[in-house]
Amino acid sequence: MTNGSTEVYLGLGSNQGDRNLYIEKALSMLDSTPGVRVEEKSSVIETEPWGFESENCFLNCAVRVNVDSTVSPESLLETCKEIETELGRNEFMEYREDGSRVYHSRNIDIDILLYGDRRISSERLTVPHPLMAERDFVMVPLRQIATDGIENAFPEIFRPALKTSAK
């Protein structure tokens, strides 16, 4: 992280169409966003869908980006949502009677996992991502690129035990 910038970690996933192409297009669009620079990408792993049934497995990866001080967490979230929409994602939110979210297949999904050492809780954004520690499809790639500083800032997330759902 350079002076005036924040180290941010994003999770990307796709289980429809040309999954690799959607991930690469999303990364290119992120990198061309003013104030956002993609620094490192994890390997891409293939995983079963989480929270719903689908014949299509996901490709998932994590990326570390540097975000300068002109980019707020909320504006980065908006950028991620705009990229998802441009790449064909339908942001229809469906919930079960118990209040839990119903998940669907998608061309691209971009989640803000960590935003520096900040903890954010707003109506639209929660950081650290609330379910990331439960999801190997997030944690396996994230561990590949996480710096010691970020691991030390969130010891509760970087637990030693992992389930094995990645292929």
Task: For the regions a language model picked out, list residue spans one by one.
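Short, flexible active-site loop motifs that bind/organize anionic cofactors or intermediates
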Residues: 9, 13, 66, 103
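Short, surface-exposed loop/turn motifs that are enriched in glycine and acidic residues
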Residues: 16, 69-73, 141
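Extended accessory regions or peripheral subdomains of proteins
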Residues: 2-27, 35
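Hydrophobic residues positioned within well-ordered beta-strands of beta-sheet architectures
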Residues: 8-10, 61, 110
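Short, surface-exposed acidic-centric catalytic microdomains
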Residues: 25, 29-71, 76-77
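Flexible, gly/pro- and Lys/Arg-enriched active-site loops
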Residues: 50-58, 74-167
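Short beta-strand-to-loop capping motifs
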Residues: 14, 63-69, 114-116
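Short, mixed-charge, low-aromatic patches
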Residues: 18-20, 31-40, 112-115
